[in-house]
Protein backbone atom coordinates (compact mmCIF):
# COMPACT_ATOMS: atom_id res chain seq x y z
CA UNK A 1 0.00 0.00 0.00
CA UNK A 2 1.62 3.35 -1.01
CA UNK A 3 2.52 5.68 1.87
CA UNK A 4 0.17 8.44 0.69
CA UNK A 5 -2.71 5.98 0.48
CA UNK A 6 -2.02 4.87 4.05
CA UNK A 7 -1.95 8.48 5.29
CA UNK A 8 -5.29 9.24 3.60
CA UNK A 9 -6.75 5.98 4.90
CA UNK A 10 -5.71 6.79 8.48
CA UNK A 11 -7.17 10.28 8.29
CA UNK A 12 -10.50 8.69 7.49
CA UNK A 13 -10.13 6.15 10.28
CA UNK A 14 -9.46 8.62 13.09
CA UNK A 15 -12.71 10.38 12.14
CA UNK A 16 -14.42 6.99 11.84
CA UNK A 17 -13.34 6.08 15.37
CA UNK A 18 -14.79 9.31 16.77
CA UNK A 19 -18.07 8.85 14.90
CA UNK A 20 -18.37 5.20 15.96
CA UNK A 21 -17.81 6.14 19.60
CA UNK A 22 -20.50 8.81 19.25
CA UNK A 23 -22.93 6.31 17.70
CA UNK A 24 -22.32 3.79 20.49
CA UNK A 25 -22.77 6.44 23.19
CA UNK A 26 -26.02 7.62 21.59
CA UNK A 27 -27.25 4.01 21.45
CA UNK A 28 -26.50 3.52 25.15
CA UNK A 29 -28.26 6.79 26.01
CA UNK A 30 -31.30 5.85 23.93
CA UNK A 31 -31.51 2.35 25.45
CA UNK A 32 -31.38 3.78 28.98
CA UNK A 33 -33.72 6.74 28.57
CA UNK A 34 -37.49 7.25 28.35
CA UNK A 35 -37.03 6.78 24.59
CA UNK A 36 -35.91 3.15 25.06
CA UNK A 37 -39.20 1.69 23.80
CA UNK A 38 -39.10 3.94 20.74
CA UNK A 39 -35.47 2.96 20.09
CA UNK A 40 -36.43 -0.74 20.05
CA UNK A 41 -39.61 -0.13 18.06
CA UNK A 42 -37.89 1.80 15.28
CA UNK A 43 -35.44 -0.99 14.51
CA UNK A 44 -38.16 -3.65 14.65
CA UNK A 45 -40.34 -1.75 12.16
CA UNK A 46 -40.84 -3.90 9.04
CA UNK A 47 -39.71 -2.48 5.70
CA UNK A 48 -40.72 -3.90 2.33
CA UNK A 49 -38.57 -3.61 -0.79
CA UNK A 50 -39.59 -4.94 -4.18
CA UNK A 51 -42.60 -5.12 -6.45
CA UNK A 52 -45.41 -7.60 -7.02
CA UNK A 53 -44.29 -11.17 -6.32
CA UNK A 54 -40.69 -10.00 -5.79
CA UNK A 55 -41.02 -8.65 -2.27
CA UNK A 56 -38.58 -8.76 0.62
CA UNK A 57 -39.95 -7.82 4.04
CA UNK A 58 -37.61 -7.50 7.00
CA UNK A 59 -37.35 -5.41 10.17
CA UNK A 60 -35.13 -2.35 9.77
CA UNK A 61 -32.52 -3.98 12.04
CA UNK A 62 -32.12 -6.90 9.64
CA UNK A 63 -31.94 -4.59 6.61
CA UNK A 64 -28.99 -2.97 8.36
CA UNK A 65 -27.35 -6.23 9.47
CA UNK A 66 -28.00 -8.24 6.29
CA UNK A 67 -28.12 -5.49 3.66
CA UNK A 68 -25.91 -2.55 4.58
CA UNK A 69 -23.31 -4.80 6.18
CA UNK A 70 -23.03 -6.62 2.83
CA UNK A 71 -21.71 -3.32 1.46
CA UNK A 72 -19.19 -3.22 4.32
CA UNK A 73 -18.03 -6.73 3.45
CA UNK A 74 -17.83 -5.71 -0.22
CA UNK A 75 -15.32 -3.05 0.86
CA UNK A 76 -13.46 -5.59 3.01
CA UNK A 77 -13.28 -7.97 0.05
CA UNK A 78 -11.90 -5.22 -2.20
CA UNK A 79 -9.20 -4.43 0.39
CA UNK A 80 -8.27 -8.10 0.72
CA UNK A 81 -7.98 -8.54 -3.05
CA UNK A 82 -5.87 -5.39 -3.44
CA UNK A 83 -3.47 -6.33 -0.65
CA UNK A 84 -3.08 -9.94 -1.84
CA UNK A 85 -2.48 -8.94 -5.45
CA UNK A 86 -0.05 -6.07 -4.90
CA UNK A 87 0.06 -4.81 -1.34
CA UNK A 88 1.14 -5.80 2.14
CA UNK A 89 -0.02 -9.41 1.68
CA UNK A 90 1.41 -9.96 -1.80
CA UNK A 91 4.45 -12.05 -0.78
CA UNK A 92 4.93 -14.68 1.93
CA UNK A 93 7.63 -12.54 3.58
CA UNK A 94 5.33 -9.50 3.81
CA UNK A 95 2.30 -11.48 4.91
CA UNK A 96 4.02 -13.73 7.46
CA UNK A 97 3.96 -11.53 10.58
CA UNK A 98 0.41 -10.12 10.25
CA UNK A 99 -0.90 -13.55 9.21
CA UNK A 100 0.66 -15.35 12.18
CA UNK A 101 -0.42 -12.57 14.55
CA UNK A 102 -3.98 -12.65 13.19
CA UNK A 103 -4.22 -16.42 13.70
CA UNK A 104 -3.06 -16.05 17.30
CA UNK A 105 -5.49 -13.18 17.78
CA UNK A 106 -8.38 -15.38 16.69
CA UNK A 107 -7.46 -18.72 18.26
CA UNK A 108 -6.55 -17.63 21.81
CA UNK A 109 -9.64 -15.41 22.42
CA UNK A 110 -11.91 -18.16 21.08
CA UNK A 111 -10.29 -20.71 23.42
CA UNK A 112 -10.68 -18.41 26.44
CA UNK A 113 -14.36 -17.85 25.66
CA UNK A 114 -14.95 -21.56 25.05
CA UNK A 115 -13.27 -22.51 28.32
CA UNK A 116 -15.68 -20.28 30.27
CA UNK A 117 -18.85 -21.38 28.46
CA UNK A 118 -18.04 -25.05 27.84
CA UNK A 119 -20.90 -26.38 29.96
CA UNK A 120 -23.56 -24.38 28.07
CA UNK A 121 -24.03 -25.45 24.46
CA UNK A 122 -26.14 -22.39 23.61
CA UNK A 123 -23.66 -19.91 25.12
CA UNK A 124 -20.84 -21.71 23.30
CA UNK A 125 -22.33 -20.49 20.00
CA UNK A 126 -20.62 -17.16 20.67
CA UNK A 127 -17.07 -18.55 20.64
CA UNK A 128 -16.07 -16.37 17.66
CA UNK A 129 -17.26 -13.06 19.16
CA UNK A 130 -13.93 -12.09 20.82
CA UNK A 131 -11.93 -13.27 17.79
CA UNK A 132 -12.78 -10.13 15.78
CA UNK A 133 -11.03 -6.75 15.49
CA UNK A 134 -12.69 -3.46 14.49
CA UNK A 135 -10.22 -2.00 11.98
CA UNK A 136 -11.73 1.50 12.05
CA UNK A 137 -11.54 1.79 15.84
CA UNK A 138 -8.11 0.15 16.10
CA UNK A 139 -6.50 2.35 13.47
CA UNK A 140 -8.28 5.40 14.85
CA UNK A 141 -6.67 4.82 18.26
CA UNK A 142 -3.25 4.28 16.68
CA UNK A 143 -3.60 7.47 14.64
CA UNK A 144 -4.36 9.51 17.77
CA UNK A 145 -0.72 8.94 18.74
CA UNK A 146 0.48 10.75 15.61
CA UNK A 147 4.20 10.53 14.76
CA UNK A 148 4.97 8.66 17.98
CA UNK A 149 4.10 5.44 16.18
CA UNK A 150 6.22 4.34 13.18
CA UNK A 151 4.34 3.90 9.92
CA UNK A 152 5.49 0.25 9.84
CA UNK A 153 3.29 -0.48 12.87
CA UNK A 154 0.30 1.12 11.19
CA UNK A 155 0.88 -1.00 8.10
CA UNK A 156 1.25 -4.09 10.32
CA UNK A 157 -2.05 -3.37 12.11
CA UNK A 158 -3.83 -2.69 8.81
CA UNK A 159 -2.63 -5.99 7.31
CA UNK A 160 -3.44 -7.88 10.52
CA UNK A 161 -6.97 -6.43 10.62
CA UNK A 162 -7.57 -7.33 6.96
CA UNK A 163 -6.51 -10.94 7.60
CA UNK A 164 -8.67 -10.90 10.74
CA UNK A 165 -11.62 -9.80 8.58
CA UNK A 166 -10.90 -12.67 6.20
CA UNK A 167 -10.99 -15.02 9.18
CA UNK A 168 -14.32 -13.54 10.25
CA UNK A 169 -15.69 -14.12 6.74
CA UNK A 170 -14.67 -17.79 6.86
CA UNK A 171 -16.14 -18.19 10.35
CA UNK A 172 -19.47 -16.73 9.19
CA UNK A 173 -19.50 -18.98 6.11
CA UNK A 174 -18.72 -22.23 7.91
CA UNK A 175 -20.15 -21.81 11.42
CA UNK A 176 -23.05 -19.35 11.22
CA UNK A 177 -24.91 -20.65 8.19
CA UNK A 178 -28.47 -21.94 8.56
CA UNK A 179 -30.15 -24.71 6.56
CA UNK A 180 -29.39 -24.37 2.85
CA UNK A 181 -31.69 -23.97 -0.16
CA UNK A 182 -30.22 -25.84 -3.17
CA UNK A 183 -32.20 -23.77 -5.71
CA UNK A 184 -31.06 -20.44 -4.24
CA UNK A 185 -27.47 -21.69 -4.10
CA UNK A 186 -27.70 -22.76 -7.75
CA UNK A 187 -28.94 -19.30 -8.74
CA UNK A 188 -26.17 -17.71 -6.67
CA UNK A 189 -23.64 -19.90 -8.50
CA UNK A 190 -25.10 -18.73 -11.83
CA UNK A 191 -24.64 -15.10 -10.73
CA UNK A 192 -21.04 -15.87 -9.77
CA UNK A 193 -20.44 -17.44 -13.19
CA UNK A 194 -21.77 -14.28 -14.86
CA UNK A 195 -19.51 -12.10 -12.72
CA UNK A 196 -16.46 -14.21 -13.57
CA UNK A 197 -17.44 -14.04 -17.24
CA UNK A 198 -17.59 -10.24 -17.09
CA UNK A 199 -14.14 -10.16 -15.53
CA UNK A 200 -12.60 -12.54 -18.07
CA UNK A 201 -14.19 -10.64 -20.97
CA UNK A 202 -12.39 -7.46 -19.89
CA UNK A 203 -15.49 -5.55 -18.76
CA UNK A 204 -14.26 -2.50 -16.81
CA UNK A 205 -17.55 -0.66 -16.24
CA UNK A 206 -18.81 -1.21 -12.71
CA UNK A 207 -22.57 -1.11 -13.22
CA UNK A 208 -22.92 -4.65 -14.69
CA UNK A 209 -21.04 -6.08 -11.70
CA UNK A 210 -23.14 -4.13 -9.21
CA UNK A 211 -26.43 -5.06 -10.92
CA UNK A 212 -25.60 -8.78 -10.85
CA UNK A 213 -24.28 -8.28 -7.32
CA UNK A 214 -27.71 -7.17 -6.12
CA UNK A 215 -29.28 -10.32 -7.61
CA UNK A 216 -26.49 -12.38 -6.03
CA UNK A 217 -27.25 -10.80 -2.63
CA UNK A 218 -30.93 -11.82 -2.89
CA UNK A 219 -29.99 -15.38 -3.90
CA UNK A 220 -27.49 -15.72 -1.05
CA UNK A 221 -30.05 -14.26 1.38
CA UNK A 222 -32.58 -16.90 0.32
CA UNK A 223 -29.99 -19.71 0.28
CA UNK A 224 -29.41 -19.83 4.05
CA UNK A 225 -25.82 -18.59 3.78
CA UNK A 226 -25.44 -15.21 5.47
CA UNK A 227 -26.19 -12.51 2.92
CA UNK A 228 -23.15 -10.39 3.78
CA UNK A 229 -20.93 -12.99 2.10
CA UNK A 230 -22.38 -11.88 -1.25
CA UNK A 231 -20.39 -8.68 -0.83
CA UNK A 232 -17.13 -10.61 -0.51
CA UNK A 233 -17.89 -12.79 -3.54
CA UNK A 234 -18.72 -9.71 -5.63
CA UNK A 235 -15.51 -7.98 -4.53
CA UNK A 236 -13.32 -10.86 -5.67
CA UNK A 237 -14.66 -10.54 -9.24
CA UNK A 238 -14.12 -6.76 -9.58
CA UNK A 239 -11.19 -6.14 -11.98
CA UNK A 240 -8.08 -4.91 -10.21
CA UNK A 241 -6.02 -3.37 -13.03
CA UNK A 242 -6.49 -1.32 -16.14
CA UNK A 243 -6.49 -2.88 -19.59
CA UNK A 244 -3.37 -2.88 -21.76
CA UNK A 245 -4.55 0.07 -23.89
CA UNK A 246 -5.13 2.27 -20.81
CA UNK A 247 -2.38 4.40 -19.31
CA UNK A 248 -0.79 3.38 -16.03
CA UNK A 249 -2.48 6.33 -14.34
CA UNK A 250 -5.97 5.37 -15.50
CA UNK A 251 -8.58 4.78 -12.84
CA UNK A 252 -8.87 1.11 -12.03
CA UNK A 253 -12.31 -0.43 -11.38
CA UNK A 254 -11.39 -1.86 -7.98
CA UNK A 255 -9.82 1.42 -6.83
CA UNK A 256 -12.79 3.47 -8.09
CA UNK A 257 -15.25 1.30 -6.22
CA UNK A 258 -13.12 1.13 -3.07
CA UNK A 259 -12.63 4.90 -2.94
CA UNK A 260 -16.31 5.46 -3.62
CA UNK A 261 -17.47 3.07 -0.90
CA UNK A 262 -15.01 3.99 1.85
CA UNK A 263 -16.65 7.28 2.96
CA UNK A 264 -20.14 5.73 2.90
CA UNK A 265 -19.04 2.74 4.96
CA UNK A 266 -16.98 4.91 7.32
CA UNK A 267 -19.44 7.71 7.94
CA UNK A 268 -22.82 6.05 7.41
CA UNK A 269 -23.02 2.25 7.41
CA UNK A 270 -20.77 1.41 10.37
CA UNK A 271 -22.11 4.23 12.61
CA UNK A 272 -25.68 3.18 11.77
CA UNK A 273 -24.83 -0.44 12.55
CA UNK A 274 -23.24 0.64 15.84
CA UNK A 275 -26.26 2.75 16.79
CA UNK A 276 -28.66 -0.08 15.94
CA UNK A 277 -26.74 -2.81 17.79
CA UNK A 278 -24.83 -1.19 20.67
CA UNK A 279 -27.84 -0.13 22.71
CA UNK A 280 -27.93 -2.20 25.90
CA UNK A 281 -30.26 -1.42 28.77
CA UNK A 282 -28.38 -1.28 32.05
CA UNK A 283 -31.58 -1.10 34.08
CA UNK A 284 -31.65 -3.85 36.67
CA UNK A 285 -28.20 -5.15 35.73
CA UNK A 286 -26.17 -5.76 38.91
CA UNK A 287 -22.41 -5.07 38.95
CA UNK A 288 -21.92 -8.83 38.88
CA UNK A 289 -23.54 -9.02 35.41
CA UNK A 290 -20.10 -8.91 33.80
CA UNK A 291 -19.14 -12.06 35.70
CA UNK A 292 -21.65 -14.22 33.83
CA UNK A 293 -19.88 -16.69 31.50
CA UNK A 294 -20.80 -14.98 28.20
CA UNK A 295 -19.80 -11.36 28.99
CA UNK A 296 -16.79 -12.51 31.04
CA UNK A 297 -15.65 -14.77 28.21
CA UNK A 298 -15.94 -11.89 25.74
CA UNK A 299 -14.15 -9.38 27.99
CA UNK A 300 -11.30 -11.76 28.79
CA UNK A 301 -11.14 -12.95 25.19
CA UNK A 302 -10.84 -9.41 23.82
CA UNK A 303 -8.55 -8.02 26.52
CA UNK A 304 -6.36 -10.99 27.49
CA UNK A 305 -6.85 -13.32 24.55
CA UNK A 306 -6.02 -10.76 21.88
CA UNK A 307 -2.86 -9.49 23.56
CA UNK A 308 -1.63 -13.01 24.36
CA UNK A 309 -2.47 -14.33 20.90
CA UNK A 310 -1.22 -11.42 18.78
CA UNK A 311 1.89 -10.63 20.83
CA UNK A 312 2.74 -14.25 21.63
CA UNK A 313 2.44 -15.49 18.05
CA UNK A 314 4.32 -12.41 16.77
CA UNK A 315 7.13 -13.11 19.23
CA UNK A 316 7.39 -16.69 18.01
CA UNK A 317 7.39 -15.61 14.34
CA UNK A 318 10.10 -12.98 14.85
CA UNK A 319 12.30 -15.07 17.16
CA UNK A 320 12.14 -18.05 14.80
CA UNK A 321 13.18 -15.91 11.83
CA UNK A 322 9.90 -16.48 10.01
CA UNK A 323 9.23 -12.72 9.86
CA UNK A 324 11.12 -9.50 10.67
CA UNK A 325 10.18 -6.98 13.34
CA UNK A 326 8.33 -3.99 11.78
CA UNK A 327 10.92 -1.33 10.94
CA UNK A 328 11.50 1.15 13.76
CA UNK A 329 9.29 -0.79 16.19
CA UNK A 330 10.18 -2.24 19.59
CA UNK A 331 8.71 -5.11 21.56
CA UNK A 332 6.68 -2.80 23.79
CA UNK A 333 5.26 -1.12 20.66
CA UNK A 334 4.16 -4.50 19.35
CA UNK A 335 2.58 -5.24 22.74
CA UNK A 336 0.63 -1.98 22.61
CA UNK A 337 -0.68 -2.83 19.14
CA UNK A 338 -1.64 -6.31 20.38
CA UNK A 339 -3.74 -4.66 23.10
CA UNK A 340 -5.47 -2.41 20.57
CA UNK A 341 -6.52 -5.42 18.48
CA UNK A 342 -8.83 -6.25 21.40
CA UNK A 343 -11.15 -3.49 20.22
CA UNK A 344 -13.71 -5.78 18.61
CA UNK A 345 -16.70 -3.42 18.69
CA UNK A 346 -18.66 -3.50 15.38
CA UNK A 347 -17.22 -6.81 14.13
CA UNK A 348 -17.73 -8.53 17.49
CA UNK A 349 -21.26 -7.13 17.77
CA UNK A 350 -21.99 -8.37 14.24
CA UNK A 351 -20.80 -11.90 14.95
CA UNK A 352 -22.80 -11.76 18.19
CA UNK A 353 -25.98 -11.02 16.26
CA UNK A 354 -25.31 -14.09 14.09
CA UNK A 355 -24.41 -16.35 17.01
CA UNK A 356 -27.67 -15.73 18.84
CA UNK A 357 -29.95 -14.97 15.90
CA UNK A 358 -32.59 -17.56 16.80
CA UNK A 359 -36.14 -17.68 18.08
CA UNK A 360 -34.95 -19.26 21.33
CA UNK A 361 -36.05 -17.10 24.32
CA UNK A 362 -32.48 -17.32 25.64
CA UNK A 363 -31.22 -15.39 22.61
CA UNK A 364 -32.55 -12.04 23.88
CA UNK A 365 -30.77 -12.41 27.23
CA UNK A 366 -27.55 -13.47 25.55
CA UNK A 367 -27.84 -10.53 23.15
CA UNK A 368 -27.72 -8.12 26.10
CA UNK A 369 -24.76 -9.98 27.59
CA UNK A 370 -22.93 -9.90 24.25
CA UNK A 371 -23.30 -6.13 23.93
CA UNK A 372 -22.21 -5.63 27.54
CA UNK A 373 -19.14 -7.83 27.07
CA UNK A 374 -18.13 -6.35 23.71
CA UNK A 375 -18.44 -2.75 24.87
CA UNK A 376 -16.54 -3.43 28.11
CA UNK A 377 -13.77 -5.51 26.52
CA UNK A 378 -13.30 -3.09 23.62
CA UNK A 379 -13.15 -0.07 25.95
CA UNK A 380 -10.62 -1.75 28.24
CA UNK A 381 -8.42 -2.87 25.34
CA UNK A 382 -8.52 0.50 23.60
CA UNK A 383 -7.73 2.60 26.67
CA UNK A 384 -4.93 0.37 28.00
CA UNK A 385 -3.44 -0.09 24.52
CA UNK A 386 -3.42 3.67 23.94
CA UNK A 387 -1.73 4.32 27.30
CA UNK A 388 0.92 1.63 26.73
CA UNK A 389 1.85 3.05 23.32
CA UNK A 390 1.79 6.63 24.56
CA UNK A 391 4.10 5.83 27.47
CA UNK A 392 6.44 3.73 25.33
CA UNK A 393 6.64 6.45 22.66
CA UNK A 394 7.19 9.62 24.66
CA UNK A 395 9.68 10.81 22.07
CA UNK A 396 8.18 10.94 18.54
CA UNK A 397 9.61 8.34 16.22
CA UNK A 398 10.87 9.17 12.81
CA UNK A 399 8.52 7.78 10.21
UniProtKB/Swiss-Prot annotation:
Name by which UniProt lists this protein: Na(+)/H(+) antiporter NhaA
Tell me which Gene3D superfamilies the record gives.
Na+/H+ antiporter like domain
Principal subcellular localisation of the protein: membrane
Q: Which Pfam families match?
A: Na_H_antiport_1
Query: How does the record say this protein sits in the membrane?
Result: Multi-pass membrane protein
Q: Is-annotated flag, keyword rRNA processing?
A: no
Would the keyword Ion transport turn up in this protein's UniProt record? yes
Family to which the UniProt record says this protein belongs: Belongs to the NhaA Na(+)/H(+) (TC 2.A.33) antiporter family.
Q: Where in the cell is it found?
A: Cell inner membrane
Q: Which cysteines are joined by disulfide bonds?
A: none
The record's section on PANTHER family has: NA(+)_H(+) ANTIPORTER NHAA, SODIUM ION/PROTON ANTIPORTER NHAA-RELATED
Alphabetized, the UniProt keywords read: Antiport, Cell inner membrane, Cell membrane, Ion transport, Membrane, Sodium, Sodium transport, Transmembrane, Transmembrane helix, Transport
**Function per UniProt:** Na(+)/H(+) antiporter that extrudes sodium in exchange for external protons.
Q: Which InterPro entries match?
A: Na/H_antiporter_dom_sf, NhaA
Q: Where, by residue number, does the polypeptide cross the bilayer?
A: 12-32, 60-80, 94-114, 126-146, 155-175, 178-198, 206-226, 263-283, 284-304, 336-356, 372-392
Q: Which Gene Ontology terms cover its molecular function?
A: sodium:proton antiporter activity
GO BP term, example: regulation of pH
Q: Which organism is it from?
A: Rhodospirillum rubrum (strain ATCC 11170 / ATH 1.1.1 / DSM 467 / LMG 4362 / NCIMB 8255 / S1)
What this protein catalyses is: Na(+)(in) + 2 H(+)(out) = Na(+)(out) + 2 H(+)(in)
List the GO cellular component terms. plasma membrane
Amino acid sequence: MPLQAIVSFLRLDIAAGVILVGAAVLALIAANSPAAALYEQVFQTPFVIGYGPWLLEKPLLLWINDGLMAVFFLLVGLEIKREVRGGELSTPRLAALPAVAAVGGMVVPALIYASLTWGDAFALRGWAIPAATDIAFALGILTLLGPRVPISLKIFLTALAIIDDLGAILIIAFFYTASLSPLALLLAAACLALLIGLNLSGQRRLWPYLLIGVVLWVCVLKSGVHATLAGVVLALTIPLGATDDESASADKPLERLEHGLHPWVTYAILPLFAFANAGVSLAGLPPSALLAPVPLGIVLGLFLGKQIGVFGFSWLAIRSGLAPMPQGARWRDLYGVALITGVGFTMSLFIGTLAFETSDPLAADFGTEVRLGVLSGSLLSGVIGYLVLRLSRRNPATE
